[in-house]
């Protein structure tokens, strides 16, 4: 018996040595089993339910040109409308609250807390999902540009304590060309190296915030399985297919089945469809048909299925819920969503 135990110990030591050489085991390595919702999802009980998320405002749209919510009061109203239409989650970005500066992002913890508090006061049931994406540094006007790329987002997570937060899971050249053959904006790099991903994962784990892995391209989808294989992530994993960014994967329904093949079966996934109505709505319908979850809102599109301009995220959610029911499924309640996504 002693020799058997010694043999097992030797094998374990060799394995740990190998993992350390590969820089996988670290002091603060994330273990998603620490989330209180680990293994709480039973596919046999609520597998027909669809998590419907409302993306209320985004980071790029100018409120002077488009009617998007900026202030805590406006965000609370938009969240209430989306909830009443059938959304169980709201995904939010923070905008500069100074007069005339609402077109700029904010990483002020006070802004994040004020917005999330207003939403929770208006609709205590709804799940709040924070953005964490930065291009360059996570700077804030009041910080004097001294923050690093994760400092602002982490400070906002600590202040607002959402149940879910976006985890941008790979880098992307963020590009768009005009019909005239010029750049719509100066080419940008949306940098999300593994080191940054680890930092954000560790922060979310410590705060008991569930990561939602944002995948803008096919290689990022495939990377999630690699993160899992090396121990950086563990199931249950929540994954978002961000479809329609000009330099990412296209918003095409036929892509979804191929992308599903690159996920582990236990992964919970949703489609975020960006663009005009001829691309977004068929893609969202296909996602619902294939068992996925879905997201829409003024961050993702301004257009209803008939091509008319939407007045609010609530109006977009109303149309999305109609599609969910047309394919024979039902939107999940907030309580069901917490079970499905493993936040409870």
Predicted regions and their residues:
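Active-site beta->alpha loop and helix N-cap motifs at the rims of alpha/beta catalytic domains
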Residues: 112-191
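N-terminal mitochondrial targeting presequence
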Residues: 1-34, 41
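Active-site mouth loops of central-metabolism enzymes
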Residues: 58-74, 134-147, 186-190, 270-276
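C-terminal helical cap(s) of enzyme catalytic domains, especially alpha/beta-barrels
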Residues: 306-325
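Catalytic alpha/beta core domains of metabolic enzymes, predominantly
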Residues: 164-298
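N-terminal small/glycine-rich loop or linker at the start of catalytic domains
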Residues: 42-67, 169-184
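Glycine-rich, proline-tolerant flexible connector loops at the mouths of alpha/beta enzymes
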Residues: 89-112, 242-243, 303-305
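Alpha-helix-loop-beta-strand connector modules within alpha/beta enzyme cores
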Residues: 102-130, 200, 259-266, 320-322
């Amino acid at each position: 018996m002693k020799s058997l135990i010694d043999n097992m110990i030797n094998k374990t030591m060799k394995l740990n040595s190998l993992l350390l050489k590969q820089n996988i085991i670290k002091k603060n390595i994330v273990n998603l089993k620490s989330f209180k919702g680990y293994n709480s999802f039973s596919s046999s009980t609520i597998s027909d339910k669809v998590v419907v998320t409302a993306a209320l405002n985004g980071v790029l749209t100018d409120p002077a040109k488009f009617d998007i919510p900026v202030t805590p009061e406006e965000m609370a109203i938009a969240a209430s409308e989306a909830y009443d239409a059938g959304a169980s989650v709201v995904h939010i970005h923070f905008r500069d609250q100074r007069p005339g500066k609402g077109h700029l992002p904010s990483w002020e913890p006070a802004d994040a807390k004020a917005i999330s508090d207003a939403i929770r006061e208006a609709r205590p049931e709804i799940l709040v999902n924070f953005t964490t994406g930065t291009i360059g540094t996570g700077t804030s006007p009041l910080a004097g540009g001294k923050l690093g790329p994760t400092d602002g987002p982490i400070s906002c997570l600590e202040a607002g304590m959402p149940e879910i937060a976006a985890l941008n899971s790979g880098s992307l050249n963020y590009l768009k060309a005009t019909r005239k053959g010029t750049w719509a904006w100066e080419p940008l790099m949306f940098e999300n190296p593994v080191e940054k991903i680890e930092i954000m994962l560790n922060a979310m784990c410590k705060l008991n915030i569930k990561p939602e892995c944002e995948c803008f391209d096919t290689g990022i989808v495939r990377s999630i399985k690699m993160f899992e294989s090396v121990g950086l992530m563990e199931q249950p994993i929540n994954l978002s297919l961000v479809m329609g960014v000009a330099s990412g994967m296209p918003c095409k329904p036929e892509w979804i089945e191929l992308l599903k093949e690159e996920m582990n079966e236990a992964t919970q996934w949703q489609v975020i469809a960006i663009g005009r109505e001829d691309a977004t709505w068929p893609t969202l319908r296909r996602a619902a048909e294939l068992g996925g979850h879905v997201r829409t809102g003024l961050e993702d599109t301004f257009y209803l299925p008939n091509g008319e301009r939407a007045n609010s995220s609530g109006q977009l959610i109303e149309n999305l819920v109609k599609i969910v029911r047309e394919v024979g499924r039902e939107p999940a309640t907030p309580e069901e969503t917490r079970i499905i996504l493993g936040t409870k």
